Amino acid sequence: MNLINEKLNNLENSATKSPKEAVVLLNMGGPNSLYEVGVFLKNMFDDPFILTIKNNFMRKMVGKMIVNSRIEKSKKIYEKLGGKSPLTPITFALTERLNELDPSRFYTYAMRYTPPYASMVLQDLALKEIESLVFFSMYPQYSSTTTLSSFNDAFNALKSLETFRPKVRVIERFYADKKLNEIILNTILSALNNCKSQDFVLIFSVHGLPKSIVDAGDTYQQECEHHVSLLKELMQQKNIPFKEVLLSYQSKLGPMKWLEPSTEELIEKHRKSNIIIYPLAFTIDNSETLYELDMQYRLMAERLAVKEYLVCPCLNDSIEFAKFIIELVKNLKSE
């Protein structure tokens, strides 16, 4: 009887004990309303990792010009998505699932360009008396424009809290993990819905970058290419053939030379084939996946008379992705 009571007490204590480690999922964010579209664009184009103009005054001036030229077009895009970005609510749903699956840690999220900002989230974690943190980049491949920008923002926010000094570890890339790539491959097969893979051209579409950023040493292009090669190897191992497997870059902005080929170019080039697109650089659906790939490019594919045009969803708040995140955190070595 004493043993039963002891076990019940242990269960009760573990249920009420607050986690001392927090995992903060870092992403770019997106407008939570049409009003926030301006906030989102202003913060993005004021980011020195995005607009790499060293002079602060000049960067703000150029950024303001870009925002003014894009704000109305961007609002129309988000109107088509229900008046807001899906990224924040999906990320919230993912953290809810993570906290349910792994109550030993507290999972939350911080956004780079829209609330909740890292400063807000870290203040909350300080009140929770968190002793250790994992900053988890939601970008599978590393780039100064995304990963480094988010980490820089999070660490600056942490430094501003003088009395909050938790142990910090980071997960800055995870594209090479075989378990992730098996989830991606299963997502692609599910989107095919029993169609034969060999009848499709598979395009891995990633967010584009100005070539000048890569020339300055950013490893993003190299990591995207490596990611595609790993997925090709996995397809070969599992005997899942496609007509072709290609990498493309989307979301070009401005007159500068960007990474090529563009997603639009490849859709046009393979217009006589069935096409399936997987958004390889995104883990959570956003305007670039749901509007650009699934609406804008779908219309283009229809004009080109592409017979089958399929777009895979991102990993989002799927239980497979949640379990992958938990395992990655558990296996993270102490620094």
From Swiss-Prot:
<dbReference type="GO" id="GO:0004325">
    <property type="term" value="F:ferrochelatase activity"/>
</dbReference>
<keyword id="KW-0350">Heme biosynthesis</keyword>
<comment type="similarity">
    <text>Belongs to the ferrochelatase family.</text>
</comment>
<dbReference type="InterPro" id="IPR033644">
    <property type="entry name" value="Ferrochelatase_C"/>
</dbReference>
<dbReference type="GO" id="GO:0005737">
    <property type="term" value="C:cytoplasm"/>
</dbReference>
<keyword id="KW-0456">Lyase</keyword>
<dbReference type="InterPro" id="IPR033659">
    <property type="entry name" value="Ferrochelatase_N"/>
</dbReference>
<keyword id="KW-0627">Porphyrin biosynthesis</keyword>
<dbReference type="GO" id="GO:0006783">
    <property type="term" value="P:heme biosynthetic process"/>
</dbReference>
<keyword id="KW-0963">Cytoplasm</keyword>
<feature type="binding site">
    <location>
        <position position="207"/>
    </location>
    <ligand>
        <name>Fe cation</name>
    </ligand>
</feature>
<dbReference type="Pfam" id="PF00762">
    <property type="entry name" value="Ferrochelatase"/>
</dbReference>
<feature type="binding site">
    <location>
        <position position="288"/>
    </location>
    <ligand>
        <name>Fe cation</name>
    </ligand>
</feature>
<comment type="function">
    <text>Catalyzes the ferrous insertion into protoporphyrin IX.</text>
</comment>
<keyword id="KW-0479">Metal-binding</keyword>
<dbReference type="InterPro" id="IPR019772">
    <property type="entry name" value="Ferrochelatase_AS"/>
</dbReference>
<dbReference type="GO" id="GO:0046872">
    <property type="term" value="F:metal ion binding"/>
</dbReference>
<comment type="pathway">
    <text>Porphyrin-containing compound metabolism; protoheme biosynthesis; protoheme from protoporphyrin-IX: step 1/1.</text>
</comment>
<keyword id="KW-0408">Iron</keyword>
<protein>
    <recommendedName>
        <fullName>Ferrochelatase</fullName>
        <ecNumber>4.98.1.1</ecNumber>
    </recommendedName>
</protein>
<dbReference type="InterPro" id="IPR001015">
    <property type="entry name" value="Ferrochelatase"/>
</dbReference>
